[in-house]
């Protein structure tokens, strides 16, 4: 009987999902993206060769895998063509192995222009978006005015819809944000130049998945960003514009929730965050700088430096409850090599003096929150590239065990380096 496994970020994104998805895809027939857009980069290193995927599922590097982009993904034709070109130049057959839902909202130049105009207007109160038009595209979807992949089949109607929506956007860009208008003909020409390529890959993703499940095929759902950036369950308003939690699989790919067998939450051995928003365990000292240096903590898409801090078990508990996480994969364990002490946040001291074991929902409720730490001895040995858990230093194993105890979730996979071989699978999600 086949298994359906969700791989998602349990923190604020950048946990190393791409490597783990790639690692597990030798077991699956389908890899599915179900939310987000090209705003999150999934970095894979295979035999020393680096690949950054932003939109196409990470399974594309496995020849036997079919990749699906579900309706919950906002799709930029420009980004898709660029990524396809990069992969095809390396001999990877994308067009015959990538299928796209006709219900995917399109990201077009006016979305990008609006995204950048808004962030500029907010100044130092900016949310910290990637400026790739993700939020405005989701707005159009909810407002039921957006153009979708399926609209590309009728070019005359597409052109008419585009004119109406561009009038709406340009009025705001010019008169409210004092920005340049987006050119209608240029936008239309750019989309039509690639429309036939995209429509040739259109398929009924939900039905494909249902048939695959009934046949007993293994399916992997690849999440983007992280749980604490979920539009509903994250630190609002410092969140992304999609549902990054496991529930997004049902709404973003048309896959029934009862058919999900395992949810693998990806966690770093510490915490990072890009952009604004609450971060209780953030470090502003030399320790934080050293974690950032050793972990090479810069965004795969934006290049922005990531904020770094100790592991936050309180925030993780919210991820566990909202995702029904079955097991964790801990990445970047080797980054903590050499520290004399390592801390785990096990509680929050609220401004009123109360102790909280679960993270607040809204960003405003995090103000004045202080972390309550448990300190563990570190280790001086090198763990980089270790693939046998018994070869890990005793203090490393104690740290892992303590995180399991505090969170109540077992660690199924350990990653000690960026390459797919630098991994320990303690409990295979597809074998459970």
UniProtKB/Swiss-Prot annotation:
Listed cofactors:
Mg(2+)
User: Pathway involvement?
Assistant: Purine metabolism; AMP biosynthesis via de novo pathway; AMP from IMP: step 1/2
Free-text cofactor note: Binds 1 Mg(2+) ion per subunit.
Q: Where is the active site?
A: 14 (proton acceptor), 42 (proton donor)
Q: Which reaction does it catalyse?
A: IMP + L-aspartate + GTP = N(6)-(1,2-dicarboxyethyl)-AMP + GDP + phosphate + 2 H(+)
The subcellular location is: Cytoplasm
Chain positions recorded as IMP binding sites? 14-17, 39-42, 130, 144, 225, 240, 304
Chain coiled-coil ranges:
none
Does the record bear Transcription in its keywords? no
Residues reported to bind GTP: 13-19, 41-43, 306, 332-334, 415-417
Which cysteine pairs are joined by S-S bonds? none
Q: Please provide one cellular component term from the Gene Ontology annotations of this protein.
A: cytoplasm
Q: Where does substrate bind?
A: 300-306
| Major localization class | cytoplasm
Looking at the UniProt entry, the stretches that span the membrane are: none
Q: Which UniProt keywords apply?
A: Cytoplasm, GTP-binding, Ligase, Magnesium, Metal-binding, Nucleotide-binding, Purine biosynthesis
Look up the domain of life of the source: Bacteria
The GO terms this record gives for MF are: adenylosuccinate synthase activity; GTP binding; magnesium ion binding
Q: What does this protein do?
A: Plays an important role in the de novo pathway of purine nucleotide biosynthesis. Catalyzes the first committed step in the biosynthesis of AMP from IMP.
What NCBIfam families does UniProt report for this protein, alphabetically?
A: PRK01117.1, purA
Protein family (similarity comment): Belongs to the adenylosuccinate synthetase family.
Q: Under which name does UniProt file this protein?
A: Adenylosuccinate synthetase
Q: Which organism is it from?
A: Histophilus somni (strain 129Pt) (Haemophilus somnus)
């Amino acid at each position: 009987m086949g298994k359906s496994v969700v791989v998602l970020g349990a923190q604020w994104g950048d946990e190393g999902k791409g490597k783990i998805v790639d690692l597990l895809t030798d077991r699956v027939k389908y890899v599915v993206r179900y939310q987000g857009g090209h705003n999150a980069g999934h970095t894979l290193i295979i035999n020393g060769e680096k690949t950054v995927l932003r939109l196409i599922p990470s399974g594309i590097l496995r020849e036997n895998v079919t990749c699906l982009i579900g309706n919950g993904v906002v799709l930029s034709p420009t980004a898709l063509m660029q990524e396809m070109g990069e992969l095809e130049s390396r001999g990877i057959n994308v067009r015959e192995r990538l299928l796209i839902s006709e219900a995917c909202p399109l990201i077009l130049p006016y979305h990008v222009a609006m995204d950048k105009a808004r962030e500029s207007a907010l100044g130092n109160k900016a949310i910290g978006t990637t400026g790739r038009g993700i939020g405005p595209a989701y707005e159009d979807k909810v407002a039921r005015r957006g153009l979708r992949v399926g609209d590309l089949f009728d070019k005359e109607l597409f052109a008419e819809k585009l004119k109406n929506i561009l009038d709406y956007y340009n009025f705001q860009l010019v008169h409210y944000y004092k920005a340049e208008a987006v050119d209608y003909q240029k936008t239309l020409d750019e989309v039509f130049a690639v429309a036939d390529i995209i429509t040739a890959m259109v398929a009924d993703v939900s039905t494909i998945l249902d048939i695959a499940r009934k046949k007993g095929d293994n399916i992997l759902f690849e999440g983007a960003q992280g749980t604490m950036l979920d539009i509903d369950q994250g630190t609002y308003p410092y969140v992304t514009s999609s549902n990054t939690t496991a529930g997004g699989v049902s709404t973003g790919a048309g896959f029934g929730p009862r058919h999900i067998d395992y949810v693998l939450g990806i966690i770093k051995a510490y915490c990072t965050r890009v952009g604004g928003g609450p971060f209780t365990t953030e470090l502003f000292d030399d320790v934080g700088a050293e974690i950032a240096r050793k972990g090479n903590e810069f965004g795969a898409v934006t290049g922005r430096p990531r904020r770094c801090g100790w592991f936050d078990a309180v925030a993780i508990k919210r991820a566990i409850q909202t995702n029904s996480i079955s097991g964790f994969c801990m990445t970047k364990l080797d980054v903590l090599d050499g520290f004399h002490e390592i801390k785990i946040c096990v509680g929050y001291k609220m401004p009123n003096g109360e102790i909280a074991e679960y993270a607040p929902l809204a960003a405003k409720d995090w103000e004045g929150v202080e972390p309550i730490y448990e300190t563990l001895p570190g280790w001086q040995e090198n763990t980089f590239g270790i693939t046998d858990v018994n070869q890990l230093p005793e203090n490393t194993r104690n740290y892992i065990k303590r995180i399991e105890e505090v969170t109540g979730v077992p660690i199924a996979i350990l990653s000690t380096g960026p390459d797919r071989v630098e991994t320990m699978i303690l409990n295979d999600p597809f074998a459970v």
